[in-house]
């Protein structure tokens, strides 16, 4: 009879995968992930049948953490798309600065070709306000299947640059975050907004 799965082991594997992917990208080996979680590699595959399943599960795990962080402070009375987008940008940057390994990992995962359509849909469903806001304000080309990953990559590159400068010079972090937002807004959204 198979032993029941432990939630603690699963969380340890997800945390080890976060660190490994943040450091080495999606090429991080399952052996390293398992070792850093304190389990045998075979144990990893009891929890995740394939590395792709681990990648998709980790993406959803990190996305849920990020979305919970953003939703926690969300003022749902804001109706202006630019103001709402600024709030989400600020929350995203704050989360990334407070959790740099998680941010590096989610960035690697978001632009990988390993995410399934189901995973992308589940991630979109976690924060419907964000999905709706994107449909209202993001250029339609970046909402298309063909260019969505490119648009995500642009957003993430601008966010990463903003985080790098904010972390290097905390006294000017607010200025960098505001300038980063304006650059992102002009690059990815419809001009009529």
UniProtKB/Swiss-Prot annotation:
Keywords: DNA-binding, Repressor, RNA-binding, Transcription, Transcription regulation
Annotated HTH tetR-type domain residues: 7-66
DNA-binding region: 29-48
SUPFAM superfamilies, A to Z: Homeodomain-like
Keyword tRNA processing: no
One Pfam family this sequence matches: TetR_N
Observed phenotype of the null mutant: Deletion results in a multi-drug resistance phenotype in the DT104 strain S/921495, with fourfold decreases in susceptibility to nalidixic acid, flumequine, enrofloxacin, ciprofloxacin, chloramphenicol, florfenicol, and tetracycline. Significant increases in expression of RamA, efflux pump subunits AcrA and AcrB, and TolC, in DT104 S/921495 and 14028s / SGSC 2262 strains.
Outcome following mutation: residue 18 to P: In BN18/21; significantly decreases susceptibility to quinolones, and to various antibiotics. Complementation with the wild-type ramR gene increases susceptibility to quinolones, and to various antibiotics
Single GO molecular function: RNA binding
Recorded superkingdom: Bacteria
Subunit note: Homodimer. May bind DNA either as a homodimer or as a pair of homodimers. Various chemicals reduce DNA-binding in vitro, including bile acids, such as cholic and chenodeoxycholic acids, and antimicrobial drugs, such as berberine, crystal violet, dequalinium, ethidium bromide and rhodamine 6G. Binds small regulatory RNA StyR3.
Other facts: Binding of RamR to the promoter region of the ramA gene is significantly reduced as a result of deletions of various short sequences; deletion of two consecutive bases probably contributes to the multi-drug resistance phenotype of the BN10055 clinical isolate. RamR binds to various chemicals in vitro, including bile acids, such as cholic and chenodeoxycholic acids, and antimicrobial drugs, such as berberine, crystal violet, dequalinium, ethidium bromide and rhodamine 6G.
Main function: Transcriptional regulator. Represses the transcription of the transcriptional activator RamA and, thereby, leads to repression of the expression of the efflux pump subunits AcrA and AcrB, and TolC. Acts by binding directly to the promoter region of the ramA gene. Promoter binding may be inhibited partially by the small regulatory RNA StyR3, perhaps thereby ensuring a basal level of expression of RamA.
UniProt-listed PANTHER family: HTH-TYPE TRANSCRIPTIONAL REGULATOR RUTR, REGULATORY PROTEIN
Protein name: Transcriptional regulator RamR
Gene of this entry: ramR
């Amino acid at each position: 009879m198979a032993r029941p799965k432990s939630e603690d082991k699963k969380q340890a594997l997800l945390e080890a995968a976060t660190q490994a992917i943040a450091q080495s990208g999606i090429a991080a080996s399952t052996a390293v992930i398992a070792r850093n979680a304190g389990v045998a590699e075979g144990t990893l595959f009891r929890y995740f049948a394939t590395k792709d399943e681990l990648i998709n599960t980790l993406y959803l795990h990190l996305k849920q953490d990020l979305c919970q962080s953003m939703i926690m402070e969300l003022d749902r009375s804001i109706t202006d798309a630019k103001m709402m987008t600024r709030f989400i940008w600020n929350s995203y940057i704050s989360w990334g600065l407070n959790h740099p390994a998680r941010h590096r990992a989610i960035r690697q995962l978001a632009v990988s070709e390993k995410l399934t359509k189901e995973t992308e849909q589940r991630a979109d469903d976690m924060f419907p306000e964000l999905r709706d806001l994107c449909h209202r304000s993001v250029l339609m080309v970046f909402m298309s299947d063909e260019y969505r990953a490119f648009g995500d990559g642009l957003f993430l590159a601008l966010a990463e640059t903003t985080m790098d400068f904010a972390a290097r010079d905390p006294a000017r972090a607010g200025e960098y975050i505001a300038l980063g937002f304006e650059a992102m807004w002009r690059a990815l959204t419809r001009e009529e907004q």
